[in-house]
């Protein structure tokens, strides 16, 4: 976020704090009943923030940027609904429809909030933002398979598993199946498709106003490329960008 002006950067940090607070509920090892209670409390908290019940710094900061950038309450509630899908174990070999809905809620809604903060919120930029959000979320899924296994999650959609002859919903058996790497390759093509669609829409958008989003896109394109090079036969090798790769992408973001 170094290429954002200070106020916009601080707004993004406030959104990040909200997302982190939301994710921490789903990713904890607490009982499901406790997670559901906390999610209910978070939904109430968002309603109270919009009703100016601001009794702590988190609420005050978030409300300041909600008002400044006219952020729609629906997007925050959509993010919470996405986390609920994890808590309720819906995201184990989901249908294509559920998978797409999940990607919108946990990534697309964040992208639309970001566009409001960037000051570039129109039909074209929203289309770009949603394509990009899908691509980023799918890349995250393909990167975090090992970690998601430990949380009892398997995000690869059922239709892709079926296409590769994987009929079980048991995560350990899915990962052991010799066709699982092919299923991951199939999902990576869906990420590529969304990146390509984002690139097409970007041609008719203001690149100057979307610098941060473009930098994120370039970063994740490279990450996906490295994931495909490693493959999914073994999940032991962690895939990350080197400091040089990050620096190069940052320089590219400044001059684009």
Region roles according to the model:
Residues 1-137, 142, 146-256:
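Catalytic cores of Mg2+-dependent Asp-rich isoprenoid enzymes
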């Amino acid at each position: 976020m170094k290429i954002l002006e200070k106020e916009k950067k601080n707004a993004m940090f406030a959104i990040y704090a909200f997302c982190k607070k939301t994710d921490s509920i789903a990713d904890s090892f607490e009982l499901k009943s406790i997670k559901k209670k906390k999610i209910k409390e978070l939904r109430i908290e968002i309603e109270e923030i919009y009703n100016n019940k601001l009794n702590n710094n988190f609420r005050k900061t978030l409300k300041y940027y909600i008002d400044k950038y006219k952020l729609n309450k629906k997007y925050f509630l959509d993010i919470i609904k996405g986390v609920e899908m994890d808590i309720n174990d819906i995201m184990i070999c989901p249908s294509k429809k559920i998978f797409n809905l999940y990607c919108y809620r946990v990534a697309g809604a964040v992208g639309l909030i970001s566009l409001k903060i960037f000051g570039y919120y129109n039909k074209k930029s929203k289309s770009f933002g949603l394509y990009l959000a899908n691509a980023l979320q799918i890349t995250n899924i393909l990167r975090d398979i090992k970690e998601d296994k430990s949380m009892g999650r398997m995000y690869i959609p059922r239709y892709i598993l079926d296409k590769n002859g994987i009929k079980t919903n048991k995560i350990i058996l899915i990962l052991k199946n010799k066709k699982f790497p092919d299923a991951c390759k199939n999902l990576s093509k869906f990420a590529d498709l969304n990146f390509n669609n984002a690139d097409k829409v970007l041609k008719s958008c203001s690149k100057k106003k979307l610098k941060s989003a473009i930098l994120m896109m370039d970063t994740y394109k490279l990450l996906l490329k490295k994931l495909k090079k490693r493959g999914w036969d073994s999940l032991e090798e962690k895939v990350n960008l080197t400091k040089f790769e990050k620096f190069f992408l940052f320089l590219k973001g400044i001059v684009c």
